[in-house]
């Protein structure tokens, strides 16, 4: 669905109202930070494989958003978007190791390990294990799609993403082989490949529900809209019946996350 100027004006008005609401709602949130979610055999793992939890004290049966930051798999830092701290949702901000220091498979495994931690611990914060959403922007969106579609990553931790994840919500994520991996292989940035490190390699009809969001096709990064449009088409051709796709007009790769947060919250609110 392409969100035109009229839709975007409405979203921006909602965004302004949301900022006011978040300021009030965020005051009710408690924080648990610097939680090590994975065994730390070295100082780098101990530094990077940590997560933060934002939650409302006393809540029960709350939806849980596991959030993966962007940064090209080579940078960025874990955080919890202010816009997601509302309506009682529990938000988990995940850090992970970068491909400059470890293999891409290890980075993806970090993402899977963090989700395993959530399943093992989030109930004590009031989270509902049947309402766990995986979301992320850019590189974070890529990680969401990889662990949601290549079942081997979460199966290692006893989790079936098709049955146990409420929905996958990648924002402007790479769906071909990630450019950071292609760079390590000596492949040019604008030369696309699809291999075992491409979410497209794993498209299937029985995956978890998906909310796929892209920025404006005219200002997105490296044809990212077209990548995601093809991704959605291939999911549907493979029989997936629960894929929602948005393009947000006027927003580039960097700033599309703000309206995407609103779309995710609305999506969660509409789930049964």
Pin down the residues of each PLM region.
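Alpha/beta-hydrolase active-site loop
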Residues: 103-123
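Short amphipathic alpha-helix adjacent to the substrate-entry channel of hydrolases
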Residues: 77-94
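C-terminal catalytic histidine-bearing segment of alpha/beta-hydrolase fold enzymes
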Residues: 213, 229, 236-272
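N-terminal cap/lid segment of alpha/beta-hydrolase-fold proteins
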Residues: 27-59
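Short beta-strand element of the alpha/beta-hydrolase
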Residues: 61-70
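Primarily recognizes the serine-hydrolase "nucleophile elbow" in alpha/beta-hydrolase
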Residues: 119-183
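Hydrophobic h-region of N-terminal signal peptides that target proteins for export
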Residues: 16-25
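The feature captures the conserved acid-bearing segment of alpha/beta-hydrolase catalytic domains
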Residues: 159-162, 167, 173-179, 191-229
């Amino acid at each position: 669905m392409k969100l035109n100027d009229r839709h975007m004006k409405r979203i921006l008005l909602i965004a302004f109202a949301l900022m006011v609401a978040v300021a009030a709602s965020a005051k009710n949130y408690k924080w648990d930070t610097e939680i090590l979610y994975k065994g730390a055999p070295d100082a780098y793992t101990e530094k990077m494989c940590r997560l933060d939890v934002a939650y409302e004290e006393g809540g029960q049966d709350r939806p849980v958003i596991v959030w993966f930051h962007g940064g090209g798999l080579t940078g960025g830092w874990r955080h919890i978007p202010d816009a997601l701290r509302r309506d009682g949702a529990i938000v988990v901000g995940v850090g992970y190791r970068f491909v400059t220091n470890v293999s891409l498979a290890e980075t993806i495994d970090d993402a899977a390990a963090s989700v395993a931690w959530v399943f093992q611990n989030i109930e004590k914060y009031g989270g509902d294990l049947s309402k766990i959403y995986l979301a992320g922007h850019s590189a974070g969106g890529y990680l969401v799609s990889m662990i949601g579609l290549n079942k081997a990553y979460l199966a290692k931790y006893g989790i079936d993403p098709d049955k146990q994840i409420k929905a996958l919500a990648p924002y402007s994520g790479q769906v071909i082989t990630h450019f950071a991996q292609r760079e390590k292989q000596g492949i040019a940035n604008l030369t696309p490949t699809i291999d075992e490190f491409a979410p497209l390699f794993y498209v299937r009809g029985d995956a978890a529900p998906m909310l796929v969001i892209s920025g404006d096709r005219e200002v997105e990064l490296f044809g990212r809209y077209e990548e995601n449009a093809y991704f959605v088409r291939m999911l549907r051709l493979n029989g997936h019946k629960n894929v929602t796709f948005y393009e947000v007009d006027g927003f580039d790769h960097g700033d599309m996350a703000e309206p995407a947060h609103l779309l995710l919250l609305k999506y969660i609110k509409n789930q049964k």
